[in-house]
């Protein structure tokens, strides 16, 4: 990457994440810039999130499906739990840029949930519960509860 150019939020570049054990993303893969443009413009580093073509666990708020667009050649998903601070000059070839406001909003919302910045406080006296897909089935088919919203993480 040209050292003079500053990256922007939502841009996708190839980045070599190196070799790791376990579930940490490895190797050369696309990554999206998730750091604010003001910070990108004032420093040599940025924060990126890995992108994978293995689209699973879509119910997690940290997994943002972006499909086969923005320069990507396969249906892909952003992994907001797989972030790294990197030198801007170490980013590889430019792939594309996320220009869809709904996806950008989903990324911001997912980052808040991933880093524990989301307020889950119930409003009023209502009994508010956040359920995994498996537990949700018990509530949907019960006469004791009223399920008002099935997807509280929808952007």
Which residues does each predicted region cover?
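Short, charged beta-turn/beta-strand-edge "cap" motif at the junction between a beta-strand
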Residues: 18-22
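C-terminal terminal-subdomain/extension
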Residues: 4-5, 69-129, 133, 137-155
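Compact nucleic-acid interaction/catalytic patches
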Residues: 23-28, 33-68
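Short, charge-rich amphipathic segments
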Residues: 3-6, 34-50, 113-116, 134-137
């Amino acid at each position: 990457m040209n050292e003079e150019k500053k990256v922007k939020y939502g841009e996708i570049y190839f980045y070599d994440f190196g070799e790791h054990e376990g579930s940490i993303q490895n190797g050369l893969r696309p990554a999206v810039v998730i750091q604010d443009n003001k910070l990108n413009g004032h420093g040599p580093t940025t924060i990126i999130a890995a992108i994978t073509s293995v689209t699973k666990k879509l119910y997690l708020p940290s997994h943002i499906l972006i499909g086969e667009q923005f320069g990507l050649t396969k249906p892909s998903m952003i992994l907001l739990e797989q972030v790294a601070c990197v030198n801007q000059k170490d980013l590889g070839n430019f792939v594309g840029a996320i220009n869809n406001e709904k996806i950008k909003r989903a990324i911001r919302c997912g980052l808040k949930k991933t880093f524990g910045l989301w307020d889950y406080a119930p409003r009023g006296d209502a009994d508010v519960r956040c359920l995994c897909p498996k537990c949700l089935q018990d509530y949907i088919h019960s006469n004791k509860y009223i399920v008002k919203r099935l997807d509280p993480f929808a952007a």
